Regions:
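Conserved beta-strand-loop-beta-strand hairpin that lines the nucleotide-binding pocket
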Residues: 1-11, 56-144
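STAS-typified acidic loop motif
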Residues: 9-22
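Heptad-repeat coiled-coil signal-transmission/dimerization helices
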Residues: 20, 24-27, 112
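Conserved short strand/loop->alpha-helix "switch" segment adjacent to the catalytic nucleotide/phosphoryl-transfer site
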Residues: 25-49, 101-102
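Solvent-exposed, charged/polar functional surfaces in cytosolic regulatory/catalytic domains
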Residues: 26-30, 54, 118
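Short alpha-helix lining the ATP-binding pocket of the histidine-kinase-like ATPase
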Residues: 49, 53, 57
Length: 144
């Protein structure tokens, strides 16, 4: 499937009880506007959901704290930038897992690492900034 257009970048600041849901809806809408195939659209939504959920579950983000989500795309990849307050978290470092049978014990971050490439990580003034690239799948389901 050849994508005909590249949508304008999307930048959102999200907070409150619907923030994770709103982030997933925004990612899905962005994927649709970008003309992403099913696999790429699904992966983008899952990566956004996992990262946003981890902010609340493990990153100390409170209900009133806001995080920023930026999405942009090229012909070959979608770039995702997530900026959030909290303790420093460098996704390049190995994570000690406390496995939980009910939650999957780190499976979400494993998906994020499998489906994306870390472009950069910064920690400045109490805020993490993580930039990832997700390759866009072709019609056959493989990344370009």
């Amino acid at each position: 499937m050849r994508r005909e257009s590249i949508p304008a970048p999307l930048r959102l600041s999200l907070s409150g009880p619907t923030a994770v849901h709103d982030a997933v809806v925004a990612a899905s809408t962005f994927a649709e506007r970008a003309g992403l195939a099913g696999a790429s659209a699904s992966r983008l939504a899952i990566v956004v959901e996992e990262l946003a959920m981890n902010l609340y579950d493990h990153g100390g983000l409170g209900a009133d704290d806001a995080f920023d989500l930026e999405l942009s795309s090229s012909r070959a990849e979608v770039r995702l930038v997530l900026i959030a307050p909290g303790p420093e978290f460098d996704p390049r470092q190995s994570i000690s897992r406390e496995f939980s049978s009910s939650r999957g014990g780190g499976a979400g971050l494993d998906l994020v690492r499998t489906w994306s490439r870390l472009l950069e990580h910064d920690y400045v003034e109490g805020r993490n900034r993580v930039a990832l690239a997700l390759p866009i799948a072709t019609a056959s389901g493989t990344a370009d």
